[in-house]
């Protein structure tokens, strides 16, 4: 079905929950609302295309079947799936090359320099030991979109001091970020960790809210730097061995960017097909039937 229609239905459902005094959290992506979460009732209402499995569901294509041309819908949906699958394959290949970049670049890192530097950095910007372990909260601050990698720079507005590690591969910056993160948690300070949107696990940036201090990793797709920054260049933590893999790094980095660009092109194509699908459903303004169906299923 149409993403626009699904979002309108979720918005209408959230308004109904609000009228009925049901606690509801609205979950959004870069494109808009994709889910509603009711923690107290243990209910999740989500876009079926998000990959969440459930024995309950509402098929908008059936619910509004007589209001749009089915054959056009089938064609647009198939084209969108082809381009989405193509994008996924390129992103997976790009992730593999990114891992190879980190592996190659890690061969010439002087780890003793990183340990000494991060210790000095923490002593300068950290706080006193609290005698307990801090709590870590993981968030995404960047996302991969048809327009490229979007980065929410407002996340760093609360910081008075930011150390920016300029690193072409992320091999050095990830280690610096991780060590400062460990120092902070071990000293009892809560940490907000921002995870890489490509692999979903590597911590790229951190903020220590209580200290108003953050560490930011700047690479090819994170060129916009936060204000109040102090730049740290990754090259100072490498030995002369880096010259041996210089050409391989350059070639792999070029291939990585090429794969990412192909992924962006596929996402643009998928977005165009999505717009065609949205156009088919644009004349449907009444979402009451779908909202009522959601309410009935939740009451079963």
Label the model's feature ranges:
Residues 1-14, 149-150, 154, 158-184:
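Glycine-rich phosphate-binding P-loop
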Residues 2, 47, 62-69, 110, ...:
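Alpha-helix initiation/capping motif
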Residues 14-81, 183-261:
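Conserved nucleotide-sensing/catalytic segment adjacent to the nucleotide-binding pocket
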Residues 32-34, 48, 121-135, 250, ...:
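Rhodanese-like catalytic fold shared by cysteine-dependent sulfurtransferases
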Residues 72-126, 248-297:
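An accessory alpha-helical subdomain
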Residues 87, 148, 177, 184, ...:
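Long, contiguous hydrophobic alpha-helical segments, chiefly transmembrane helices and signal peptides
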Residues 112-154:
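N-terminal pre-Walker A segment at the start of P-loop NTPase domains
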